[in-house]
Amino acid sequence: QPLANALTEEEVSAVTRQLAAMPAPAPVPVHRSEMPTDAAQKIALQGAWERQIPACVSCHGPAGVGVGDGFPPLAGQSAAYLAAQLNAWRSGTRHNDPNDLMGHIAKSLSAEEVQAVATYFASLSGQEAKP
């Protein structure tokens, strides 16, 4: 925000126009009916319903590109960031989920699953998905 505070109204408008003109990435369909190749893909694409864990893409959109403000993008985020957020929900230190959807999911994941899912989504660019 310090940089944004230094901009004039005209510069803010110019940056806004430039960003608005950029094309949004087109989501690529994720073929969830195909067999995942590892446990991280299974959780990301199909979930672990026997443990009440929905597929990540059920809420976060095809290939984890995000859906509105409520379900941010996962694809292309750093694995360390994603793992840190999941671990914050696991430990109860993150509370910005009014219905505790992510808290329930994160607490149901093992430490290994947290790292694997974070690494999987970090490997996606947001424009590709490899089921």
Features from the language model and the residues they span:
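C-terminal functional regions that serve as terminal interaction/effector modules
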Residues: 80-84, 88, 93-131
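Short loop/beta submotifs within extracellular cysteine-rich repeat domains
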Residues: 11-14, 24-25, 49-52, 65-67, ...
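Gly/Gly-Pro-rich "capping" loops immediately C-terminal to redox-active cysteine motifs
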Residues: 1-7, 57, 61-91, 103-108
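Extracytoplasmic/secreted proteins, especially bacterial periplasmic and envelope-associated proteins
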Residues: 2, 10, 14, 39-43, ...
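Electrostatic cytochrome c docking/interface patches
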Residues: 21-49, 126, 131
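C-type cytochrome heme-c attachment and multiheme electron-transfer modules
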Residues: 11, 44-49, 54-57, 111-113
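Hydrophobic, ordered structural segments
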Residues: 1-29
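The canonical Cys-X-X-Cys-His
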Residues: 15, 53-63, 117
